[in-house]
Amino acid sequence: MPTTSGHTTAIRASRVIGTEVKDNGGNVIGKVEDLILDKTDNAIMFAVVGFGGVLGMGEKFHPVPWSTLDFDPEFNAYVIPLSKEQLEAAPADSIKDLTKNDGSGIRDKAYDYYKAEPYWH
């Protein structure tokens, strides 16, 4: 089923992972490293956006609510309505620790930071 922007609503995770994330001006601020799924609510809990670091060292991983990312075919990237500095100030953790305690602690912080509507009940 097409969305209002003409895209279908179904997308493979393998197409999302590795896609660049840009700010509204088209500047690259990171890329989607992973998707965290919520098996209880059958939803994407958040996309993991990584940036910073050199050769994999010092990279920060930010849980970004899926609803916050918007794919822009002109940029061939997901666009987030934040600057790199705002993303740097967002909640972050090691990629392994993002799922600690079922991910709910960092999930709540991320949804608050991005002012995203919670999907869970």
Language model feature labels by segment:
Residues M1-H121:
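Peripheral interaction segments used for macromolecular assembly
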